[in-house]
UniProtKB/Swiss-Prot annotation:
Pfam families attached to this UniProt entry: Ribosomal_L20
Source domain of life: Bacteria
Any one of the GO CC terms: ribonucleoprotein complex
Highest classification ranks of the organism: Bacteria, Pseudomonadati, Pseudomonadota, Gammaproteobacteria, Chromatiales
GO process terms (BP): ribosomal large subunit assembly; translation
Keywords, ordered alphabetically: Ribonucleoprotein, Ribosomal protein, RNA-binding, rRNA-binding
GO molecular function, one term: rRNA binding
Protein's job: Binds directly to 23S ribosomal RNA and is necessary for the in vitro assembly process of the 50S ribosomal subunit. It is not involved in the protein synthesizing functions of that subunit.
InterPro entries xref list: Ribosomal_bL20, RIBOSOMAL_L20_CS, Ribosomal_protein_bL20_C
Protein's name according to its UniProt entry: Large ribosomal subunit protein bL20
Gene responsible for this protein: rplT
Family membership: Belongs to the bacterial ribosomal protein bL20 family.
Organism: Nitrosococcus oceani (strain ATCC 19707 / BCRC 17464 / JCM 30415 / NCIMB 11848 / C-107)
């Protein structure tokens, strides 16, 4: 068996890591060991935050819907309950967008929810 020298493979791997660390500051951009740690940590943060972003946006939508609902004389929970009773299937993302961009449409929906609650 001939001896396997891994210099080419190792160099390619190091090059790949250094390329991923482009834009980092200090030794994180050009020292393999430090860059590798930085990239690993960055990947972990990215993975975690892709999931957190979904939670944060939902929380933002709920805050916006609640504020608009209170202007219409309803709390958030009563509005959602009224929408379910009225069989209006609009998700929170669209409701929040209506609350910000089209107050008249949101008010109409809120009124329908009020009617459904009183029945």
């Amino acid at each position: 068996m001939p001896r396997v020298k891994r210099g080419v493979t190792a160099h390619a791997r190091h090059k790949k890591v250094i390329a991923q660390a482009k834009g980092y500051r200090g030794r994180r951009k050009n020292v393999y060991r430090v860059a590798n740690q930085a990239i690993t940590r960055a990947s972990q943060y990215a993975y975690r935050d892709r999931r957190q972003r979904k939670r944060q946006f939902r929380a933002l939508w709920i805050v916006r819907i609640n504020a608009a609902a209170r202007e219409c004389g309803l709390s958030y929970s009563r509005l959602i309950s009224g929408l379910k009773r009225a069989a209006i299937e609009i998700d929170r993302k669209v409701l929040a967008d209506l609350a910000v961009r089209d107050k008249a449409a949101f008010t109409t929906i809120a009124e329908q929810a009020k009617v459904a609650l009183s029945d």
